[in-house]
């Protein structure tokens, strides 16, 4: 059973958004504090830099339940919150014995011979504790809601062995948003106990899977972060550029959302929208024919292929842009994708336009065999003419994931290569390498930050800064907004 404690519980301040859950429970967890108090140098506690321990009572955890939290309202009434993860129990109780034991231990610590021997002095942490316990700013409902919201929002991660009783590499996660508003809003008296089990409520405990999707019931409301497994409200996610609210991780974006992010409103002019694949090698699998898969992804995404190409303006600067979409068959590059990108490059060369390609692909499309592989050479040949003969400017933007034939061709041929933070970029994926070479791929060796240190990229640019960075790069290479050009001619 895991034991948790609010680090900010004993502050006089209200519960802060940063209140973390401490797993190392040898003593009460560390509280961040910028001041240094020589009276707090208590022996036999874990060392930790830049933090001070609240107090060092050796056996204080003997009477605290493994999953119990203590809170109080503005009237001075104290309540304990019990969260039994193994048995899926949530309980709130106002039994004061918990508080009495904690205060008794605190007074015992205060009056101990250790403090009387010169270490008692002024104890700001004790004062903060007493002030907090009897003079908090929150009412009961707001306090509990804030408390549980922060608790479930934090990175609560329980080994699946706790749930299933067996060893597993996966994790189980509690989703705060699923139970908030239903499990917490109680019309019962404050003195009553509230117990909620998964059978009677929407509190959900489930194992993480490779696709990292939330339960079907809430899939239309929430998007799960691939990094911290937190939930992001889908309605607001687009306005936040698909960046996780909890950890700042850059989630996948559709090609349409990227075009909306980079291209000025009303300036997008798509190219070759009616170009579709005709199953050139008549690839048929036992599960689903290739043509049926294409039709299925077309209905699902509203796209005809895994890339959108066209002309638009970026802060008034005319640009040719291609944006790959990982949601369409993993952004795989088939004959249509290769042809659309090649035509875009040729059009940019004829019109003397700067070129941007946003890469998000699993590589060449196996359902088209060697026809998909030859797209690598065809696109590279078009770029050779565009860059070396026409002397024009090409920016490659690598997003997560960019792998296979895209990495081995136009993805790495940019005059400037930009990667998004934490993007997964590789030629062969981790699983392929490990199965082929029978060697373990080091963790993080295919992440953008590691590859940047090895010199593979020029920049790692956060999504919210990308448009302004591109605008400055284009101006640096003598591509200016249309209105600015006309004013210079006059």
From Swiss-Prot:
Gene Ontology CC annotations of this record: acetyl-CoA carboxylase complex; chloroplast stroma; chromoplast stroma
Molecular function terms from GO: acetyl-CoA carboxylase activity; ATP binding; carboxyl- or carbamoyltransferase activity; zinc ion binding
Tell me where it mainly resides: plastid
Q: Which residues are involved in binding Zn(2+)?
A: 225, 228, 244, 247
Instruction: Outline the residue ranges of the record's C4-type zinc fingers.
Output: 225-247
Tell me which Gene3D superfamilies the record gives. 2-enoyl-CoA Hydratase, Chain A, domain 1
Q: In which pathway does it act?
A: Lipid metabolism; malonyl-CoA biosynthesis; malonyl-CoA from acetyl-CoA: step 1/1
InterPro entries reported in the protein's UniProt record: AcCoA_carboxyl_beta (IPR034733), Acetyl_CoA_COase_Trfase_b_su (IPR000438), ClpP/crotonase-like_dom_sf (IPR029045), COA_CT_N (IPR011762)
**Matching PROSITE patterns, A to Z?**
COA_CT_NTER (PS50980)
Coiled-coil segments = none
Protein role: Component of the acetyl coenzyme A carboxylase (ACC) complex. Biotin carboxylase (BC) catalyzes the carboxylation of biotin on its carrier protein (BCCP) and then the CO(2) group is transferred by the transcarboxylase to acetyl-CoA to form malonyl-CoA. Is up-regulated upon chromoplast differentiation, presumably for fatty acid biosynthesis.
**Which protein family is named in the record?**
Belongs to the AccD/PCCB family.
State what protein this is by name: Acetyl-coenzyme A carboxylase carboxyl transferase subunit beta, chloroplastic
As recorded in Swiss-Prot or TrEMBL, the protein's gene is named accD
């Amino acid at each position: 059973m895991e034991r948790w404690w609010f680090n900010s519980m004993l502050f006089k301040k209200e519960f802060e958004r940063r209140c973390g859950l401490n797993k190392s429970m040898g003593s009460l967890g560390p509280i961040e504090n910028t001041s240094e108090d020589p009276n707090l140098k208590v022996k036999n506690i874990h060392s930790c830099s830049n933090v001070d321990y609240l107090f060092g009572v050796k056996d204080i955890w003997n009477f605290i339940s493994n999953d119990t939290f203590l809170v109080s309202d503005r009237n001075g009434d104290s309540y304990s919150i019990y969260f039994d993860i193994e048995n899926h129990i949530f309980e709130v109780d106002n039994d004061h014995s918990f508080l009495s034991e904690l205060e008794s231990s605190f007074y015992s610590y205060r009056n101990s011979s250790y403090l009387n021997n010169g270490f008692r002095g002024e104890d700001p942490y004790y004062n903060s504790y007493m002030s907090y316990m009897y003079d908090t700013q929150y009412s009961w409902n707001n306090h509990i809601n804030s408390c549980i919201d922060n608790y479930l929002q934090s990175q609560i991660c329980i080994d699946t062995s706790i749930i299933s009783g067996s060893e597993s590499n996966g994790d189980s996660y509690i989703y705060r948003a699923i139970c908030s508003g239903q499990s917490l809003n109680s019309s019962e008296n404050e003195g009553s106990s509230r117990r909620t089990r998964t059978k009677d409520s929407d509190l959900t405990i489930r194992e993480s899977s490779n696709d990292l999707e939330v339960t079907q019931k809430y899939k239309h409301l929430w998007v799960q972060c691939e990094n911290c497994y937190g939930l992001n409200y889908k309605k607001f996610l687009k306005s936040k550029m698909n960046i996780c609210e909890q950890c700042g991780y850059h989630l996948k974006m559709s090609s349409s959302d990227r075009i909306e992010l980079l291209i000025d409103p009303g300036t997008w002019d798509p190219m070759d929208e009616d170009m579709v694949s005709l199953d050139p090698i008549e690839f048929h699998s036992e599960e689903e024919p290739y043509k049926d898969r294409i039709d299925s992804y077309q209905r699902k995404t509203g796209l005809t292929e895994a890339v959108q190409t066209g002309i638009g303006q970026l802060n008034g600067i005319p640009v040719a842009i291609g944006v790959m979409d990982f949601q369409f068959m993993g952004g795989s590059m088939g004959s249509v994708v290769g042809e659309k990108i090649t035509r875009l490059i040729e059009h940019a060369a004829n019109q003397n336009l700067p070129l941007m390609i946003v890469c998000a692909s699993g590589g060449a499309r196996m359902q088209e065999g060697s026809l998909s592989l030859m797209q690598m050479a065809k696109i590279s040949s078009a770029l050779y003419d565009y860059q070396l003969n026409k002397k024009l400017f090409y920016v490659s933007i690598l997003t997560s994931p960019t792998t296979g034939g895209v990495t081995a061709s136009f993805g790495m041929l940019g005059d400037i290569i930009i990667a998004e933070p934490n993007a997964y970029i590789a030629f062969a994926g981790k699983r392929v390498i490990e199965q082929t070479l029978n060697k373990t791929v080091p963790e993080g060796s295919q992440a953008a930050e590691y590859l940047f240190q090895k010199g593979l990229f020029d920049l790692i640019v956060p999504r919210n800064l990308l448009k302004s960075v591109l605008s400055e790069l284009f101006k640096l290479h003598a591509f200016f907004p249309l209105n600015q050009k006309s004013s210079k001619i006059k």
